[in-house]
């Protein structure tokens, strides 16, 4: 293989790896969707989107930011499920917490459960209802009452409905009904607005949701950002905190869902109606990343003693591919592996199948690596055989290079003639590497973003397959912390593999090939340990295959 071709290949691979590490190549924030419009800027509260019919009463502001002190005590109701524990408080019948029982906040065994709703928002709690023409009624903080007991346990696979009601005497009655299904992260909300007066009520309802980044701002990264995402006509649109800070947006239907998510978790809001609503996001605190997302209905009117209902569905939980698929609403689209999704998603299912029998995700990765190696075995075999043929004609190639070193064009002609005579493809040794690059990046995206592997141990010091491997050695190594043992082993096996590969006959090319293990070790040092494990096992299998080919050449 010509030196320039090899250099181009190596540089291309390194550029791709570098770009993915630092710039999130496969999941860049999308531009605003076609159905997104600019909201009119104001010096006080953001103005209501200019989509309200002229004849309708138009509110002059989004719902006010009703805040309570997080340390205040209120009457509350707990909903207990094998998957989660949810609490609803009396003021506004809002969610005060939603913790996932099967997922921890940190890798430590004593770490608290992952909180999808938390009072760390400073008292901004989701599902706060307001009537925009009558915000003085303070529905989002008015006490709601319920006949439900203080604790509801979901069992017997029967959905439970918990209803909460409040009244503004002589004006309006509001009922919020939550429908919870056992062992499901789906939650349904129905809001009923009843006009208690004899006069016509013309209004517009807003339901506010509040989100904080899933990780502290200093730990947020470009390849695992907390961001607002919409699914519109099968296409994902992403908006980071920085995007939302630049301008006021109005998100309009049709959309399948809008969500706040990162690689591992998602808070999805699923409109039940096909139209008659819009979403308005705005940043309340850029330092903390506090986001308010307001669901606005179209203006409506109620005659005396008339009632109107509004429905929403939610998915609050992990981005487990199989779980999202069962939840429908195209929620599985939220698991986005970029350009190589069509490769990565099948790999997730295969990995999950292996895990069901091994109960160890690290072992499942090893088995998956073996399967991939078997699939690529014929191509790799031809590649190694091609390199063996190249090795046999090395003396003739050297003679040609010496004879025509002053005439590069003639030298290349003679070399191509030599390749044809001995039926050797000079690029044959590169084919398996080129074909494995898409699989490599698909695995990288999968292992870096699969919640199934989050905080899952392999063995010994490897306690999180989505995090870099670090062996504590009693002191911190600069920029690393612990010792990346798995990564070093990967580099060593790659070096052994290069030593076993037949020489191309060009000393400069051989030097480049020997530098590759060092470069890969440096790049892999902060990659997920699950990905390093895959590459290490793949190297070991390649060494075994190369040894067999060398013995039978």
Curated annotation (Swiss-Prot):
InterPro entries: Membr_insert_YidC, Membr_insert_YidC_N, YidC/ALB3/OXA1/COX18, YidC/Oxa/ALB_C, YidC_ALB_C, YidC_periplasmic_sf
GO cellular component: plasma membrane
Biased composition (Low complexity): 38-59
Residues passing through the membrane, by range: 6-26, 331-351, 360-380, 424-444, 477-497, 512-532
Superkingdom in the source lineage: Bacteria
Subcellular location: Cell inner membrane
Location of the region described as Disordered in the Swiss-Prot/TrEMBL record: 34-59
GO molecular function ontology, one term from the record: membrane insertase activity
The keyword Repressor is assigned to this record: no
One Pfam family this sequence matches: YidC_periplas
Gene Ontology process terms (BP): protein insertion into membrane; protein transport
Membrane-topology descriptor: Multi-pass membrane protein
Keywords, in A-Z order: Cell inner membrane, Cell membrane, Chaperone, Membrane, Protein transport, Transmembrane, Transmembrane helix, Transport
Signal peptide: none
Membership in a protein family: Belongs to the OXA1/ALB3/YidC family. Type 1 subfamily.
Job of this protein: Required for the insertion and/or proper folding and/or complex formation of integral membrane proteins into the membrane. Involved in integration of membrane proteins that insert both dependently and independently of the Sec translocase complex, as well as at least some lipoproteins. Aids folding of multispanning membrane proteins.
Subunit-structure text: Interacts with the Sec translocase complex via SecD. Specifically interacts with transmembrane segments of nascent integral membrane proteins during membrane integration.
PANTHER family named in the record: CYTOCHROME C OXIDASE ASSEMBLY PROTEIN COX18, MITOCHONDRIAL, OXA1
UniProt-recorded name of the protein: Membrane protein insertase YidC
Species, as recorded: Syntrophobacter fumaroxidans (strain DSM 10017 / MPOB)
